[in-house]
From Swiss-Prot:
Pfam families: TPP_enzyme_C, TPP_enzyme_M_2, TPP_enzyme_N. It comes from the Bacteria. Gene3D superfamilies: 3.40.50.970, TPP-binding domain. GO terms for molecular function: 2-succinyl-5-enolpyruvyl-6-hydroxy-3-cyclohexene-1-carboxylic-acid synthase activity; magnesium ion binding; manganese ion binding; thiamine pyrophosphate binding. NCBIfam families: menD. This is 2-succinyl-5-enolpyruvyl-6-hydroxy-3-cyclohexene-1-carboxylate synthase. Homodimer. It catalyses: isochorismate + 2-oxoglutarate + H(+) = 5-enolpyruvoyl-6-hydroxy-2-succinyl-cyclohex-3-ene-1-carboxylate + CO2. SUPFAM superfamilies: DHS-like NAD/FAD-binding domain, Thiamin diphosphate-binding fold (THDP-binding). Pathway: Quinol/quinone metabolism; 1,4-dihydroxy-2-naphthoate biosynthesis; 1,4-dihydroxy-2-naphthoate from chorismate: step 2/7; Quinol/quinone metabolism; menaquinone biosynthesis. Its EC number is 2.2.1.9. HAMAP family: MenD (MF_01659).
Amino acid sequence: MNHNEALTKQVYTFASELYAYGVREVVISPGSRSTPLAIAFEAHPNIKTWIHPDERSAAFFALGLIKGSERPVAILCTSGTAAANYTPAIAESQISRIPLIVLTSDRPHELRSVGAPQAINQVNMFANYVNFQFDMPVADGTDYMLDAIYYQMQIASQYLYGPHRGPIHFNLPFREPLTPNLERQEWLTSYSKKLPHYQKNINVQDIRHILKEKKGLIIVGDMQHQAIDQILTYATVHDIPILADPLSQLRKYNHPNVITTYDLYYRAGLDIDVDFVIRVGKPVISKKLNQWLKRTNAYQILVQNNDKIDVFPTPPSISYEISANDFFRNLIEEAAVDRKDWINMWRTLESQARNTIDKHMTNATDEAAFVKILIDKLTKDDAIFVSNSMPVRDIDNLLYNSEVEVYANRGANGIDGVVSTAIGMAVHKKITLIIGDLAFYHDMNGLLMAKINNINLNIVLLNNDGGGIFSYLPQKASAEAYFERLFGTPTGLNFEYTALLYDFTFKRFNTVADFTQEKLSHVNSHIYEMVTNRDDNMSQHQILYKKLSGILNVTL
């Protein structure tokens, strides 16, 4: 077998194996060394390829595709520093447990560490962030070449689904000439492999004595597409309140046991004795709730469908590596405990908080008011992708009486790659992105994918000309003389020109009243800019916190 035949056999087999394990989309950043595999993916009849010239943005775009499709997605780049640009998205996928398949093309071994162009050490370059990594052999036409693909792909597949999900990395060295034989299409196959079903049982006896106590809470974070119906069933039967993070997707059911305003109450000073807490999924957004979890004496049970448990904000009393549905299904027959007073207290607090927020918002003019109006405009067919920093916190406080789904990059919690991830999700869902001006600036080039692929989404841009969240930190008062330059960081950018560059329609709103009258359109892509003031945002949030504190003084 000559070099061309060996190369063709290798890359066509590799592409076919990825398909067999569920890959249906690949994001390719153009380059020379990645030619063999890029052509293999493009030639495969059932793999959709996306082309993005910026590797950093491409990787975040792939994260969005994974979030929207619930399937693993591969990214492919050329050799050299191109691969290093994947790092932020890989870090995010590792902490968020997203099955991102990283494919870095490389120089063959004889061209490494000898000064050859576009050759850096790519072996183990993502070692701190991936669950699996392998440096593939150069195509040589032997059976061992194919065995390496079959064996290593099978090992890697355990990280594509189930409790061990996360990023994997294949480094693929290619020798020139790089063009495979386009005539050998029969080597591209489209069969699928069955993956093992994962389930574990729990020993209810370990926690039965705890579950007999009256004052229990269920706290649910990001569930990452897990089934959640058994959580609601258990909470209903046993009268236990559910403190549901917006990323849990539990809020859309408007269940009477689902509590959404807990962050505002803990911020206002809520401190109730609790006997046990069942923590499910990823850690929640709410800083105040996490602080309470750290100081409470309650018995804490952690349930996560992953072997790498997130103990933040504090190690649990006991943990279970099991899906939420399997866990609560095991508990459903436990003897009932009279918790009517307990659940009714939480329902009363929730009702009073919602009424207070609704009344407050009738006269509010800050960013939160824009966010609340947006939530009320969206329907069950819509999904929100929300940026980190202040937008995700406003969503946490204001998302109730709404059937929308909410998504965010809450692994590393960075503000980079937000636009690209949202656009990736918009391929599969009707997305509205809520983002601040600094996060938008960080990833403006991600808009290119929407432009060249006709991907429609709405962007609600909260423009306070700087880093609004820093106004809530001690630096605002303790370092006032340096605050604006070091933390406020105003840019003075006119984003209308960004919209023009990437073929988005643009509309600016200076008042909440104007936005209230606006009808959102999902025909084409739009940027709706909300001009706000950081000091005004800060003061109006403080007013709302005080109103919630007043409720606690009367109710408890």
